[in-house]
């Protein structure tokens, strides 16, 4: 029984770590997406201004 309880605790610990890592990955991807959208908007604005000058 002690060994089974140890395995159960380890499984819960691993599941918790996986959930935490998943949240961190999602936050990172969200930040990357936001930054890429910002860069795309800046590039579009610069391109628009370039065409207006031509």
Swiss-Prot record:
The record's annotation in InterPro entries points to: Gas-vesicle_GvpC
Report whether Mitochondrion shows up as a keyword of the record: no
Q: Where are the sequence repeats?
A: 18-50
**Compartments where located:** Gas vesicle
Q: Which domain of life is it from?
A: Bacteria
Q: What's a single GO BP term from this record?
A: gas vesicle organization
Q: Which Pfam families match?
A: Gas_vesicle_C (PF01304)
What keywords were assigned to this record?
Gas vesicle
Which GO cellular component terms, listed alphabetically, does the Swiss-Prot or TrEMBL entry include? gas vesicle
Q: Which NCBIfam families match?
A: gvpC_cyan_rpt (TIGR02641)
Q: Which family does it belong to?
A: Belongs to the gas vesicle GvpC family.
Q: What does this protein do?
A: Confers stability, involved in shaping gas vesicles, hollow, gas filled proteinaceous nanostructures. During planktonic growth they allow positioning of the organism at a favorable depth for light or nutrient acquisition.
Q: Would you tell me the protein name for this molecule?
A: Gas vesicle protein C
């Amino acid at each position: 029984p002690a060994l089974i309880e140890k395995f159960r605790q380890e499984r819960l610990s691993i599941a918790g770590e996986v959930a935490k890592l998943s949240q961190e990955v999602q936050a990172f991807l969200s930040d990357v997406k936001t930054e890429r959208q910002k860069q795309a908007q800046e590039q579009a604005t610069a391109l628009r201004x370039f065409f207006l000058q031509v």
